[in-house]
Amino acid sequence: MYPYNPHSQRAEEFINHEEILETLAYAEENKHNIPLIDSIIEKAKLRKGLSHREAMVLLDCDIPEKNEEIYALAKQIKQDFYGNRIVMFAPLYLSNYCVNGCVYCPYHAKNKHIRRKKLTQEEIVREVTALQDMGHKRLALETGEDPVNNPIEYVLESIQTIYSIKHKNGAIRRVNVNIAATTVENYRRLKDAGIGTYILFQETYHKESYERLHPTGPKHDYAYHTEAMDRAMEGGIDDVGIGVLFGLELYRYEFAGLLMHAEHLESVFGVGPHTISVPRIRHADDIDPSAFDNGIDDDTFAKIVACIRVAVPYTGMIVSTRESQESRERVLSLGVSQISGGSSTSVGGYYEKEAEEDNSAQFDVSDNRTLDEIVKWLMDLGYVPSFCTACYREGRTGDRFMSLCKSGQIQNCCLPNALMTLKEYLIDYAAPKTKEIGEKLILEEIKSIPKEKIQEIVRKNLVEIEKGNRDFRF
């Protein structure tokens, strides 16, 4: 048995089973302790975050008026750090070849129904051109773990190909990467290739469940997987994204583990996760979510999002098209700052829509709207869709990004960049009605930029964008 130690780089010490069990017991015991709950809410108002134990008490709290306070605070913190901007991205699936046996994923090695496919570089060009023609500027690369079919060299070559494609006014300006846990040296190579964020979901922090859910393949190794973010940061990757797949294990256990992981990264590297993702298990080929006993309802999902936002105020929060329009709308105000749109979870699914019998998707999409429909929907709700990738390209990553975010100074960069990239989208890709709504929104939102000098520069740049110039940024 290992002691709990957030400073340790041993998985079973920084994600300590006994500490999680004690945290759950503490929260259960104090979920009606109003003086304690009030003190935690007051601490959260300082915008400096909460410990996993404190956040767990808020998650377990079932006093309606206190929950309303938690939701209101989450909304205010989201507004303070991220304003009304919502960053847009799309996943790009390169290959579904996989040697692992994950029981919740249709890519598992024993699945003989799914059509296996790996994109050639020529096919990647077609996929990325289709994504650029939608208006996307930011991608998340996804691939199964297979050292023969999907070696690191294939991923690196694919990144180079993606960055090289410039179709009409299109460009992919940030490539985030979601691939299996690897070595420090390979993370260094990914860094040198110019990736943005390295994303890896823990799936579950419960070691025994993890090993049962990953019975075969290299992913079976709990410690190697859980310590991946440490190796990534040692390899020079400044921005990492963590997450769990809600539904595999008790959500309370996962919530505590997720926050302990964030605390560990902050403790060891001085910077916590750049993003936290909150996917829920979904139907897919060979996978029935009802076979998993720990699914969570929409109310619980919303509470988790709110409590993560309150506990880790600086982190970006992501929900994908796994979630329905209704679910996404609810959590946008509670903490989510980044969503996917117009997504395909099939290999090669952007250039050519896939026939049902050729299914190569990782999961069924719940929000099937086009990117333009989602952009219009966001603006109708009062949000500013952002295609910005400036921080990564200006070197505002890792601790530099976090210091700006925590101080609130990031607002002088983010809103101007959001408005300028939205203007690009409206001119190059938007439907007429979307463009009309967006132009009015930009004129209103410019007034919210804190510094008048920056307002003036943005207005000049918007004129330049009208003339055909692109890629202005602060």
Range-by-range predicted roles:
Residues 1-89, 388-389, 393, 416, ...:
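Flexible, acidic/Gly-rich N-terminal and inter-domain linker regions that tether
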Residues 351-369, 374:
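C-terminal helical cap(s) of enzyme catalytic domains, especially alpha/beta-barrels
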Residues 257-261, 272-275, 279, 335-358, ...:
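Active-site pocket-lining/capping segments in soluble small-molecule metabolic enzymes
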Residues 82-83, 87-123:
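Canonical Radical SAM [4Fe-4S] cluster-binding loop centered on the CxxxCxxC motif
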Residues 109-126, 130-232, 239-248, 270-277, ...:
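Core AdoMet radical
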Residues 143, 197, 202, 223-287, ...:
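Conserved C-terminal portion of the radical SAM core fold
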Residues 90, 128, 156-163, 187, ...:
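Generic structural signal for well-ordered alpha-helices
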